[in-house]
């Protein structure tokens, strides 16, 4: 069976199922298979991951079929580029997501979450859509897009539906494409207005700076604007799993509520990323032959990065199937050991939003840790990509519970 069919059937366990079907030992670092009809090599060992991220050995353009690539990233986006054009476009986008620029965005996330949490006592709350709204309002405001709350919620929902549909999950895939077409129309006009100074809060706002820096037409600039906004909203999947994990770990909840425990919150966020990545695999194409762990790679073969296998590899992680945030307090992972959003070095194809993801999760954990709640149904369907606990994780917050995080009472907080 083609690995693409196993992904549809088994979801996050697809590569493990493929390995078993080919009679490959569970601890094998590399094995050959087929992906969308092409010979493919699945890589998990460090030599394999290094080859996957070597720009002289692998390329991305045209590897992910347009029905998926264009849904999630948009036609003509950075994610399908290679070489100098990729580096130039990425520099423009990383500049907008610089460390100095992330502080105001994370502050907006914390403020939106504090305001939402104040309404939770005495209610049942579905965490995932709540985070989509909070993160969406935060990133749209930070970007300098002057939208009222209803419009911001609509844009956030449309961007989240693109993420929700990438796993070919039936109706979610259809909704995802409807939202992709909606966004491309909306964002093309928005990019033109931003470039002309007819929209936004000013020429120095992130959205305006980005569309001016993209050397392409308004449609492509709008696509890349979505690729700056959508990743923040996509953190809602990880934020939902952070809420699920926190409910089971009262000692960690107490610790993470302390405003001074930022490093502990970062460690918890890293463990959430390790155990619940967005996707089980990434794909590329080999541009030169090689032999990896005894498996021959031919020019033109597909390369499949086994994200789930790497992030749960016993050779890299002690007790890999246990949730242990403290592992990230003890040592920092290498560039090829923790790959929930891809690996390698920042100048290459490593996700430029990785730092943003961690900081948004850290702010989310600080709010969640300050609110007592119980989980109604923790069941998770691992065959669906991307996945959340059932119902987006419904939590019950008792009446009279504190509805704001420790941040809300700290000096200088908004």
Model-predicted segments: where are they?
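Cytochrome P450
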Residues: 1-414
């Amino acid at each position: 069976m083609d690995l693409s069919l196993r992904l549809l059937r088994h979801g996050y366990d697809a590569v493990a199922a493929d390995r078993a079907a080919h009679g490959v030992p569970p601890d094998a670092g590399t094995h050959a298979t087929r992906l969308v009809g092409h010979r493919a090599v699945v890589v998990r060992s460090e030599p394999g991951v290094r080859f996957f991220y070597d720009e002289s050995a692998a390329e991305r353009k045209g590897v992910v079929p347009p029905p998926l690539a264009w849904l999630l990233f948009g036609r003509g986006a950075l994610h399908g580029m290679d070489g100098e054009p990729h580096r130039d476009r990425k520099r423009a986008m990383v500049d907008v997501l610089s460390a100095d620029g992330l502080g105001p965005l994370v502050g907006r996330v914390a403020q939106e979450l504090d305001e939402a949490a104040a309404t939770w006592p005495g209610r049942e709350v579905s965490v995932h859509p709540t985070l989509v709204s909070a993160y969406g309002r935060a990133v749209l405001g930070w970007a300098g897009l002057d939208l009222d709350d209803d419009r911001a919620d609509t844009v956030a929902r449309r961007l989240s539906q693109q993420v929700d549909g990438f796993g070919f999950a039936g109706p979610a895939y259809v909704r995802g494409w409807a939202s992709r077409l909606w966004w491309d129309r909306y964002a093309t006009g928005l990019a033109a207005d931003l470039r002309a100074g007819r929209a936004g809060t000013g020429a120095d706002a992130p959205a305006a700076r980005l569309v001016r820096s993209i050397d392409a037409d308004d449609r492509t600039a709008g696509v890349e604007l979505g690729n700056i906004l959508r990743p923040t909203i996509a953190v809602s999947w990880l934020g939902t799993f952070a809420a699920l994990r926190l409910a089971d770990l009262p000692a960690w909840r107490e610790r993470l509520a302390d405003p001074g425990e930022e490093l502990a919150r970062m460690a918890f966020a890293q463990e959430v990323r390790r155990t619940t990545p967005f996707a089980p695999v990434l794909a590329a194409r080999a541009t030169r032959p090689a032999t990896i762990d005894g498996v021959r790679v031919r020019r033109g073969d597909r390369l499949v990065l086994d994200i789930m296998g790497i992030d749960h590899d016993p050779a890299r992680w002690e007790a890999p199937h246990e949730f242990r945030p403290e592992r990230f307090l003890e040592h920092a992972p290498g560039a090829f050991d923790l790959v929930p959003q891809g690996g390698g070095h920042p100048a290459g194809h490593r996700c430029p939003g990785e730092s943003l993801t961690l900081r948004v999760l850290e702010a989310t954990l600080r709010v969640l840790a300050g609110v007592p709640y119980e989980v109604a149904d923790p069941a998770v369907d691992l065959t669906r990509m991307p996945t959340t606990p059932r119902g987006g994780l419904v939590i019950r917050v008792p009446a009279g519970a504190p509805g704001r995080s420790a941040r809300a009472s700290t000096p200088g907080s908004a």
